[in-house]
């Protein structure tokens, strides 16, 4: 998995804005892919619901021909707004994931690894306390 982009927002951030910046970074990442069809797949997934609990949003889709999973990780201490969560829980983390369409395993393993980290209270606390993107990137 290639972690392409990390971002820390100290203030609340609107979901579409955070997703847009993260997706733009993935498009400019190391592996070419069809940005328009991938965006369509990502948008369809968002419409189905992407809140996983524990404050985590995972907009994700599979991309034909992609060499390895690409990920962007966003932390918003004060929350990500404009997106549906269960019981009005505050979403503070967003993992944008693009996975090779040809490998269901890569997709599943990457999502499981991120979810596992967020279930660790110490890791979650460190991520929320991170002061810059490089520090955040090192936590992966």
Model-derived features with residue positions:
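Cytosolic covalent-transfer regions centered on His/Cys nucleophiles
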Residues: 1-140
């Amino acid at each position: 998995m290639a972690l392409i982009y990390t971002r820390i927002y100290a203030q609340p951030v609107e979901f579409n804005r955070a997703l847009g910046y993260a997706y733009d970074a993935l498009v400019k990442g190391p592996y070419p892919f069809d940005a328009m069809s991938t965006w369509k797949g990502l948008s369809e997934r968002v419409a189905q619901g992407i809140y996983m609990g524990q404050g985590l949003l995972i907009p994700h889709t599979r991309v034909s021909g992609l060499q390895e999973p690409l990920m962007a990780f966003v932390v918003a201490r004060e929350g990500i707004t404009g997106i549906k969560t269960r019981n009005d829980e505050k979403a503070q983390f967003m993992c944008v994931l693009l996975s090779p369409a040809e490998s269901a395993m890569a997709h599943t393993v990457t999502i499981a690894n991120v979810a596992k980290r967020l279930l660790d209270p110490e890791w979650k606390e460190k991520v929320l306390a991170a002061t810059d993107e490089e520090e955040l990137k090192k936590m992966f």
